[in-house]
């Protein structure tokens, strides 16, 4: 029963559902059964399905050995409701599956859940703000553009530290960062860090970036107690006093210093039920609805424990401060109860650890749309949280240091050297305006021809080049930029004028003829007939 590991990424809950359905349909043993004097081929009992699927889920690294038989029954109810299975008479659509001898079978085709389609042309790119970003509402026609010029000579001037080579300088203060600038830096760098850990090209399919509040991140980093628990500014969002007292009682059992009334038999069970009722009636899970896909995506990294812890750290920073505080106090209580050997059993049917996971998993992680695997996924996440809550709910120091250094760099005083590239970059900014597509095409076609034409003239007028070298360069230029060349030399004759023909030298007298002495005239006899 091999179960492929479903890694992080968008629609992980849907991918897990389809993976489990395919394995269940492909490998669930089918055989002949009798019921009420009738025989049915290729079917299975409810108990057989629970046994087989429970073992599959426990052996899967996507869910883990903490999956209970009750959770397996809940999943089979979802299977029956979604027509993954049907009873022997073909009935389906309701969650009336029970762990008994009732017969079920597979329908001819099993509907796999479709993946949501990505809206076209919608990309939520994480924007890294710069120190000179203009506030919202600035006209698009007056967007400052800083020209950047750098060459080897300027680089040498800025970086030379030899004695006597440092020119006079003066201090330049950067523009004051606003609170909105700092908040945007925290948000963009935090999301970029999370995207890098998850190994995704974009966070848009696992997280709505617009719902991320940068103020929450900053508050969760700096407004903490010595124990690392978030301190709330708004005390009305605190846990009720009676809930906090009940949690302290169980966390410090049996040393309950806050309790003045005497304890009775089963007192700890009533206290636990009080806490469970409060968390169970929250309007939204502690990890919030809009972060559900992000946390489920991180579950695909549990095989790499260190990476998963870092990813959970970042995700928990995105929580509202009141949610993060409630989660911190709850996880501390759950972990202490599980480690407390003096704590009496809080439930006769379950162990303490299993009880904690089953009781609080739904109030910690839950989807708004009731994903069919959310109970199993929540149990998996809560189990990992209990084992690593001290690290997960700490502020990630690497991220904090990186962002603080970035902000400090943008606020830092800089040294300005006369004549260096700093003089150019800090000069009065030029401005740009939006142009039409036709004007853009014209500029793209003809705007680059001016420097090329200047280059061509430089080749033509270069006296250091021989005619042979000049002809070679002109031939290369004509091949690379025929339009510019054609404009300069519209006809072959105009190009030929650059290389006028040299006058042909006069033929010289044959020297050998001059060296021979003149022969005297000799008379010859005429042969006359």
Curated annotation (Swiss-Prot):
This is DEP domain-containing protein 1B. InterPro entries: DEP_dom, Rho_GTPase_activation_prot, RhoGAP_dom, WH-like_DNA-bd_sf, WH_DNA-bd_sf. Residues 24-108 form the DEP domain. Transmembrane segments: none annotated. GO terms for biological process: cell migration; intracellular signal transduction; positive regulation of Wnt signaling pathway. The modification Phosphoserine is found at residues 160, 436. Pfam families: DEP, RhoGAP. PANTHER family: DEP DOMAIN-CONTAINING, DEP DOMAIN-CONTAINING PROTEIN 1B. SUPFAM superfamilies: GTPase activation domain, GAP, Winged helix' DNA-binding domain. Coiled coil: none annotated. It comes from Homo sapiens (Human). The record marks 231 as: Arginine finger. One of its GO terms (molecular function) is GTPase activator activity. Keywords: GTPase activation, Phosphoprotein.
């Amino acid at each position: 029963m091999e179960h492929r590991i479903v890694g992080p990424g968008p629609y992980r809950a849907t991918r897990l559902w389809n993976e489990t359905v395919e394995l269940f349909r492909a490998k669930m043993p089918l055989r002949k059964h009798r019921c009420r004097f009738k025989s049915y081929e290729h079917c299975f009992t409810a108990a057989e399905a629970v046994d087989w699927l429970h073992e599959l889920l426990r052996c899967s690294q996507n869910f883990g050995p903490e999956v209970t038989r009750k959770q397996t029954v809940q999943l089979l109810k979802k299977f029956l409701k979604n027509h993954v299975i049907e009873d022997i008479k073909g009935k389906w659509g309701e969650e009336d599956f029970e762990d008994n001898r009732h017969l079920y079978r597979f329908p001819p085709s099993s509907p796999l859940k479709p993946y949501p389609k990505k809206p076209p042309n919608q990309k939520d790119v994480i924007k890294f703000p710069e120190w000179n970003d203009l506030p919202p509402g600035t006209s698009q026609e007056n967007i400052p553009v800083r020209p950047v010029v750098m060459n080897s000579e300027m680089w040498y001037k800025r970086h030379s530290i030899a004695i006597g080579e440092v020119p006079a300088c003066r201090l330049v203060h950067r523009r004051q960062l606003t609170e909105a600038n700092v908040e945007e830096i925290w948000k963009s760098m935090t999301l970029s860090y999370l995207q890098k850990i998850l190994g995704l090209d974009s966070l848009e399919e696992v997280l709505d970036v617009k719902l991320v509040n940068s103020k929450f991140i900053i508050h969760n980093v700096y407004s903490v107690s010595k124990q690392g628990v978030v301190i709330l500014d708004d005390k009305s969002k605190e846990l009720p006093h009676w809930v906090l007292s009940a949690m302290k009682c169980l966390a410090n059992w049996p040393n309950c210093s806050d309790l003045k009334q005497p304890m009775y038999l089963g007192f700890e069970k009533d206290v636990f039920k009080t806490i469970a009722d409060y968390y169970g009636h929250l309007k939204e899970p502690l990890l919030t609805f809009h972060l559900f896909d992000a946390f489920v995506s991180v579950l695909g990294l549990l095989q790499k424990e260190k990476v998963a812890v870092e990813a959970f750290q970042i995700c928990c920073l995105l929580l509202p401060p009141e949610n993060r505080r409630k989660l911190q106090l709850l996880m501390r209580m759950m972990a202490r109860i599980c480690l407390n050997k003096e704590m009496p059993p809080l439930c006769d049917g379950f162990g303490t650890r299993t009880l904690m996971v089953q009781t609080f998993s739904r109030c910690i992680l839950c989807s708004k749309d009731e994903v069919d695997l959310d109970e199993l996924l929540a149990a998996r996440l809560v189990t990992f949280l209990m084992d690593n809550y001290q690290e997960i709910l700490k502020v990630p120091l690497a991220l904090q240091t990186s962002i603080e250094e970035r902000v400090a760099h943008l606020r830092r005083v800089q040294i300005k050297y006369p004549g260096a590239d700093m003089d150019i970059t800090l000069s009065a900014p030029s401005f740009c305006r939006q142009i039409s597509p036709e004007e853009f095409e014209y500029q793209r076609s003809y705007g680059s021809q001016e420097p090329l034409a200047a280059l061509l003239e430089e080749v033509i007028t270069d006296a250091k080049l021989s005619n042979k070298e000049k002809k070679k360069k002109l031939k290369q230029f004509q091949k690379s930029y025929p339009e510019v060349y054609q404009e300069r030399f519209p006809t072959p004759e105009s190009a030929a004028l650059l290389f006028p023909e040299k006058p042909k030298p006069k033929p010289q007298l044959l020297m050998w003829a001059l060296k021979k002495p003149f022969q005297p005239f000799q008379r010859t006899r005429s042969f006359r007939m």
